[in-house]
A protein has these predicted regions:
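Catalytic active-site module of serine/aspartate enzymes centered on a nucleophile-bearing elbow/loop
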Residues: 288, 292-331
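Active-site loop/oxyanion-hole signature of alpha/beta-hydrolase fold enzymes
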Residues: 81-118, 152
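N-terminal cap/lid segment of alpha/beta-hydrolase-fold proteins
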Residues: 21-32
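Flexible "cap/lid" loop of the alpha/beta hydrolase fold
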Residues: 146-184
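Conserved HGGG/HGGXW glycine-rich cap/lid loop of the alpha/beta-hydrolase fold
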Residues: 31-89
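Conserved hydrolase catalytic core segment
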Residues: 115-160
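Conserved serine/cysteine hydrolase catalytic core
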Residues: 209-296, 303
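Classical Sec-dependent N-terminal signal peptides that target proteins to the secretory pathway
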Residues: 1-23
Length: 331
């Protein structure tokens, strides 16, 4: 590892509610960002892939979602799974949110000297990618993007996302007081158990998954400071959505969108017909939006998946690996 890179990376011990977590971090804009490279940071001669995370139903939104794909790709690539500020590093009053993360990414990409990297972004992290591309067109760090179930930046879907996050914004003060008192730790542990069961089910408990890494990230979620940061991030989600919606996906950036059928789980489980109709409209809105984006570049592609698992990178890892190999094989 170069002396310059060694200067950037250090070991940080987090005071978790259960056990210390040793985290690999990089410092930008005066704060630490957690990342995982699966020991590939020195492999500068290999193609680079950046993995970015977004939330699932539990609102957990960290790089645990890459604990299988990451180590698999690390066999042949230089990998960086990067977490947004404050979600893992127990940074008080962290600079949270997808907007700020877009700024952080520009600094991270420069420090890591990334060029022509493939970005694979899950769920809402497309907000940061789109803002980064809009704000830093001069950087040539990214050659192509794969989005898995990205946020739909249309008026209808944005209104829906805002409604989901509204309780956090409206009740933030009382929520933060509750969290700071340690009252959310038990609930987080329950959510961790739900998440772990889902990952085990989707992977069949495959030992190729970095289960130790999953455990470390789950321990970080139990840290009260990280919990406060997560609540603060959700409370400004509406602002992040509006910021991204004010920009356009650059027509020069090839894009692959993987659209799973995860909404079908909600639709089938809903008894209220009006709510069910709204869910179907949301699903159709996504298809239309994704197809509009992928029509911008001749190399872009829209992939409709029959998988009902939102975590496509676990449920369909072989298909995703094959897709990535095809993308990387192109000049």
């Amino acid at each position: 590892m170069s002396n310059f890179f060694s200067y950037l990376v250090y070991i940080l011990v987090l005071n978790s509610a259960v056990m210390p977590l040793v985290a690999q971090t990089i410092k930008v804009d005066g704060h630490a960002l957690h990342f995982e490279s699966w020991n590939t940071e020195e492999n500068v001669d290999k193609p680079s892939i950046v993995l970015l995370s977004g939330p699932i139903d539990t609102w957990h939104s960290d790089s645990a979602w890459w604990a299988w794909l990451g180590p698999e790709l690390a066999k042949t690539h230089r990998i960086f799974a990067i977490d947004r500020a404050g979600l893992v590093t127990a940074t008080p009053e962290a600079k949270v949110g997808y907007q700020h993360f877009a700024q952080d990414l520009a600094e991270v990409f420069e420090l890591l000297q990334l060029k022509d990297a493939l970005v694979v972004a899950f769920a809402s992290s497309n907000i940061s990618v789109q803002l980064y591309l809009a704000q830093h067109p001069q950087q040539q760090a990214i050659k192509q993007v794969i989005l898995i179930d990205p946020d739909v930046l249309s008026p209808f879907s944005i209104a829906r996302y805002k409604n989901d996050a509204a309780p956090f914004k409206q009740n933030l003060t009382s929520y933060i007081d509750y969290v700071k008192a340690g009252n959310y730790i038990a609930r987080t542990a329950q959510k961790n158990a739900t998440d772990l069961a889902q990952l085990q089910s989707l992977s069949g408990g495959n030992q190729a998954v970095d289960w130790q890494y999953v455990d470390k990230l789950q321990q970080a979620r139990l840290n009260i400071i990280n919990q406060v940061n997560l609540f603060n991030e959700i409370a400004i989600y509406d602002q992040d959505l509006d910021a991204a919606a004010s920009t356009q996906w650059p027509a020069s950036m090839p894009l692959i969108i993987i659209d799973t059928d995860f909404e079908a789980e909600y639709i089938d489980g809903e008894q209220d017909e009006s709510v069910k109709a709204d869910l179907k409209t949301w699903q159709q809105d996504a298809v239309q939006y994704y197809q509009q984006l992928t029509a911008l570049h001749p190399a872009s592609l829209y992939i409709a998946s029959s998988s009902r698992a939102h975590l496509y990178q676990f449920a369909q890892i072989e298909q995703l690996m094959t897709l990535i190999a095809k993308v990387q094989a192109k000049p």
